[in-house]
Amino acid sequence: MDGRAEMEVVRTTKGNAAGEVSVHVVTTESTVQSTHLPTTAFIFPSQANATTINLPTSTLEIQRFPREPPRNTGAERPEKGVGSEPITATVIPQISGVQTCNTVRVLEWKDGVATLPGSNLRFRINEYGTLKVVSADKMPPAEAVKEGHAKKDGDSDVAPTSRDNTIVAQDVPEQSKLPTADSICHCDTCGRRHVSDGAREGRGFCSEHCHQQFKERSVIVENSASSTSATEILKPVKKRKRKDYQSPSEEDYESEQMEEKQEEMKNSVGDSAISNPEAHAWSQHSTEGPGASEEKKEGWSWASYLEEQKAVAAPLDLFQDYQVASQHKNGFKVGMKLEGIDPQHPSMYFILTVAEVCGYRMRLHFDGYSECHDFWLNADSPDIHPAGWFEETGHKLQPPKGYKEEEFSWTNYLKITKAQAAPKHLFVIRNTHEAPPGFEVGMKLEAVDRMNPSLICVATVTDVVDDRFLVHFDNWDDTYDYWCDPSSPYIHPVGWCQEHGKPLTPPQDYPDPDNFIWEKYLKETGASAVPAWAFKVRPPHGFLVNMKLEAVDRRTPSFIRVASVEDVEDHRIKIHFDGWSHVYDFWIDADHPDIHPIGWCSKTGHPLQPPLRPKEPASSAHSGCPTLGCKNIPHTKSSKYSFHHRKCPTPGCDGSGHVTGRFTAHYCLSGCPLAEKNQGKLKADLSDTEASTRKRNLIGFPQRKKSRHHGSFRGRPPKYRKIQQEDFQTISSDNMHQSLFMSALSAHPDRSLSLCWEQHCKLLPGVAGITATTVAKWTIDEVFSFVQTLTGCEDQAKLFKDEMIDGEAFLLLTQADIVKIMSVKLGPALKIYNAILMFKNADDTLK
């Protein structure tokens, strides 16, 4: 019962007895809780306990105060006289601070009943947790009193505590003047006074409704009393709109559980691409990794797998520091922006955004460009830099698509995009910022073409960053460029080929390639050669065949798989994914950041794809991918790996080169220069003037044709997909969607763009079997009829007729012409423009 109380200690003098004290408590009860009139009561401590409330040991005596005049409270109960009203005193004990509740400590407790020493007043705790005066004939039986309401034996001087340090009491008349309990009672539930008929079962209640409410509340109090302390019992039971908790700490515990569950849900969404890595440590003892992984569910672990295969793990000392698990966590977050090197154009720097984080790896997205160009790398990669790095180092930064280079500013760009630049401390600090001695921009050297390893070409140092430099092949496209250090086995000083009897490929379009002389070329270009002493010798690696490790799947870069060393060279190893066909094997440098010792995934929190088991189906019936073990997990719209199951089927071919010479790689039999059926075509294409050069330089790979971009260009140059022709019967339309529209990313794509012919014909059936030579002879009406056959382009066909576009003009149209000049919507324009590209591709294929 909430209310305000005021205590007054009045010192009075009666006769000659000085120091006599009168104590009274005046309460003003809330009208919400009870409507009975406020009264005044006195509590008299015994002589022994008089000092407890800091009163003198003199006799305490009752001093009667007149009642306040009755106030109209709006209650319906009849007003009775003062002398005939039954009066009940209520004392609210203090819950906290038992030692300071001096007034309550004067009560003596036994079996849940308190007795005021020196009087016949008795008290008990009602359903509200407050003290209530009871008469002798209304004393509850001892067995009905709960243990939680009783005082422990031997501690009779300590009483239950109350909610506040206040006494709420009513006027207590002399015991002889109290009316009998059989006649007038005080309702234990609502507080109203009523005349008991003596026949009702609940004599302490004014109605059956109050009696029932008291029973329900008593059940709650009794249930909680058995598991709570005396101080907790005295707490009033509040009504809850939420669920009732069985223990005081249950609510807090459940709240903590809910917070933990919500946190786990956030982590699961943020790491939706992460399954639990395998359990393993560097010492080959099982160590559980974070998350909940596929291999964990299957019970896969490195320790058991090595024992099962009787294999050995590649020792740690064979790996470079950046290949071993870093001591630092990956602090990059999705949405952070930074600067980085384009892996397809290593000489160009772009603005990148973190699109996905997985363990110590992350997927980066080129701002303003399609997701098909996204790529994966480690958080400590030297290819990424903080925002503003290009200004500090004097490099040229390619702005996002739609921005002009001279107008771009990091500060404004971050404001416009409402993004955050990746903090500088997240980037790995290199050991040295000094350029490798002897290597300067513009110096010449001889370098191996990484895409065609049989070729050693004339090259130039075009950039130097920290301890690395960029190798560029003279007069070739920058797609062949690569970064390396002085110990790279792919670079040699000028004259190395002549000393070792190796053929040297001169710069493209060099006037007299058969008589190339370094001294003459250096004089013509005004350049100098890198001194021989600047080159360092890298010792061979120590990897052995069948050693186990973890490697990134090049066809699905988001995956890291269990792998074995299939073959070795001095500085390269051949990777084989355990359980997979050898068709997917590939060569990689022994110091490449995409290979790691066993347990790297577990330590960095990256999921590891376990070996493919024979029990696993080759592919699900509806997966659309015939690759063994493929779970139909698509790439991130990657143009290069949009069909990750494809690779050249020619034995011994690693996919390098192309029979036409227009591509640096191939993925099908028709483009393979090593295929028997293509040998005749390859020989026929060789002219007499090129025969001697190709016989000297070409060992299984065609000599590259010039594909360099002429003139200046803005933004990122277009990238074209290189996909072979295969049986596409099981490929779904969803998988073909990206391939169809990627060819129209650039308004002026290369004529040599390789297209997925059969795949596109399914979505554009009208182009099947038609070449550009045939289309060039079309009339205006034939162009009109063709556009009408394209799904969704019926309304646009009339525009071509109105503009009087014949076949030859039709082939000259670009995507920009169709959209901007002819005002064709983007969807139909893409279909029409892709049809034009396919006509041209069909014509080139026949040639």
Curated annotation (Swiss-Prot):
Keywords: Chromatin regulator, Metal-binding, Nucleus, Repeat, Repressor, Transcription, Transcription regulation, Zinc, Zinc-finger. InterPro entries: Mbt (IPR004092), MBT_L3MBTL1_rpt1 (IPR047361), MBT_L3MBTL1_rpt3 (IPR047362), PcG_chromatin_remod_factors (IPR050548), SAM (IPR001660), SAM/pointed_sf (IPR013761), Znf_C2H2C (IPR002515), Znf_C2H2C_sf (IPR036060). The gene is L3MBTL1. Zn(2+) binds at C648, C653, H666, C672. It is found in: Nucleus. Residues 65-87, 142-163, 237-296 are annotated as: Disordered. Homodimer. GO terms for biological process: negative regulation of DNA-templated transcription. Residues 778-842 form the SAM domain. MBT repeats lie at residues 300-400, 408-507, 516-611. GO terms for cellular component: nucleus. Coiled coil: none annotated. Residues 473-480 are annotated as: Interaction with monomethylated and dimethylated peptides. Signal peptide: none annotated. The keyword Phosphoprotein does not apply. The record marks N452 as: Positioned at the entrance of MBT 2 and is required for recognition of monomethylated and dimethylated peptides. This is Lethal(3)malignant brain tumor-like protein 1. One of its GO terms (molecular function) is histone H4K20me2 reader activity. Residues 65-82, 144-155 have a biased composition (Basic and acidic residues). Polycomb group (PcG) protein that specifically recognizes and binds mono- and dimethyllysine residues on target proteins, thereby acting as a 'reader' of a network of post-translational modifications. PcG proteins maintain the transcriptionally repressive state of genes: acts as a chromatin compaction factor by recognizing and binding mono- and dimethylated histone H1b/H1-4 at 'Lys-26' (H1bK26me1 and H1bK26me2) and histone H4 at 'Lys-20' (H4K20me1 and H4K20me2), leading to condense chromatin and repress transcription. A zinc finger (CCHHC-type) spans 639-682. The record marks D449 as: Mediates recognition of monomethylated and dimethylated peptides. It comes from the Eukaryota. The MBT repeat 2 specifically recognizes and binds monomethylated and dimethylated proteins. In contrast, it does not bind trimethylated proteins. The MBT repeat 1 does not bind methylated peptides but inserts a proline ring in a Pro-Ser-Ser/Thr sequence context. PROSITE patterns: MBT, SAM_DOMAIN, ZF_CCHHC.
